[in-house]
Amino acid sequence: MPQQRKGGRRRRKVDLIAANHIDYVDYKDVDLLKHFISERGKILPRSVTGTSAKNQRKVANAIKRARIMGLLPFVAED
């Protein structure tokens, strides 16, 4: 009886920042930043979002600025 393989090839994640040719990640663009935050309010890692290291730093800094300005919550509401 032949063994069957589980799973398959994983699709490579696309860097959302590079794909849309965004040079500056604005902290006021909350709709864009919400793609990089979990439902608990934590910043998602590169392995989940598929961003490059450079763009991950830009996103993290923008999220932190938006939190300080009160545009994004520090933690999720229950």
Curated annotation (Swiss-Prot):
Pfam families: Ribosomal_S18. Keywords: Ribonucleoprotein, Ribosomal protein, RNA-binding, rRNA-binding. GO terms for biological process: translation. The keyword Metal-binding does not apply. GO terms for molecular function: small ribosomal subunit rRNA binding; structural constituent of ribosome. One of its GO terms (cellular component) is cytosolic small ribosomal subunit. InterPro entries: Ribosomal_bS18 (IPR001648), Ribosomal_bS18_sf (IPR036870). The keyword Oxidoreductase does not apply. It comes from the Bacteria. Belongs to the bacterial ribosomal protein bS18 family. Part of the 30S ribosomal subunit. Forms a tight heterodimer with protein bS6. Binds as a heterodimer with protein bS6 to the central domain of the 16S rRNA, where it helps stabilize the platform of the 30S subunit. This is Small ribosomal subunit protein bS18. It comes from Lactobacillus delbrueckii subsp. bulgaricus (strain ATCC 11842 / DSM 20081 / BCRC 10696 / JCM 1002 / NBRC 13953 / NCIMB 11778 / NCTC 12712 / WDCM 00102 / Lb 14). The lineage of its organism: Bacteria, Bacillati, Bacillota, Bacilli, Lactobacillales.
